Each structure stands twice: as C-alpha cells, then as structure tokens.
Amino acid sequence: MKINLLSICLFILLIIPSLLFSQRGETGDKVFSNRFPPDVLNYFSEASLEIKNTVEHDIIVLIRDQYRKYVRHVYIRNGERFTLKNLPITRIYVQFKSLEFYFEDKKVSVINFGEKNIFTFFYDASMEGNYFKISEEEFFKP
C-alpha cells in the first residue's frame, strides 16, 4: 500500500508541472501560421530586428511593411528576446497581441540594409503611451 501511495504521489508531482506549462508556447513559435501567408524573407538585406519582451506576460509580435502587408510574426515569452533575421528593407509597423488585446506601436521604424534594430516592450501596453489599440480583424489581416 505504501508503494502504491508513493508511486501515485511521485506520478502527480511529475505530471502537474508539465500540465501547467503545456499550453504555453516557446519563444520563436509561429502560433498563428495557419492564419497568415508565408513569411517574407530577404536573404540579401542582412537586416534584423531583435525584440525584447520585458513585460510580465507573453506576447505575439507581428511585423508589417510600409503597405501594411504581413511580413512575419513570432511568439515571445515574458523576459525573453527573439531576433527576426533576413527582414526586407522597408518601413515597418509593429503590432502585437498582449493578453486578450491587440495593439500597434505609434512609431514607424525603418529597416535599412545590414542594420541590426532593437524593439523593446518595456511596460504593459494597455497603459497609455506609445501604443494604440487595434481590432482582432486588423491584426489578422494578411
């Protein structure tokens, strides 16, 4: 009886942590790849964008070009960073999903040949600041 109880307790202790984290993606995942067209890559530009997530929750970042067409998206866990490489040379708009809301950065960034750019999410986007709220439809348009 003691062996069965010990086995059950050990089993529960091993299963619970995996269940808690099983629904959470990994940084770099393409969680909405079925809702967007293929990623836009430019292997000759050598341009990159490092995205740092310093807020207390995970985010999904979406990059759009100067015509607001889809370029790339990525899932980033809180406290982590991810670098998007081989970006096209263009002006970019940064949109993101934070908790259950969708936002866009008010600033337009320029990606030039060979540049290494950095974008940092430094506080909760639902607070007033450099972001404005967008609809789910705007976020998921191709």
Where are these regions (language model features)?
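Bacterial N-terminal signal peptides that target proteins for export
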Residues: 1-9
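Primarily secretory-pathway and cell-envelope proteins
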Residues: 23-67, 98-142
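Short beta-strand segments within Ig-like beta-sandwich modules, predominantly Fibronectin type-III
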Residues: 72-76
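Short Pro-Gly-centered beta-turn/loop motif in secreted/extracellular proteins
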Residues: 83-91
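A short, solvent-exposed beta-strand micro-motif common in secreted/extracellular proteins
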Residues: 90-100
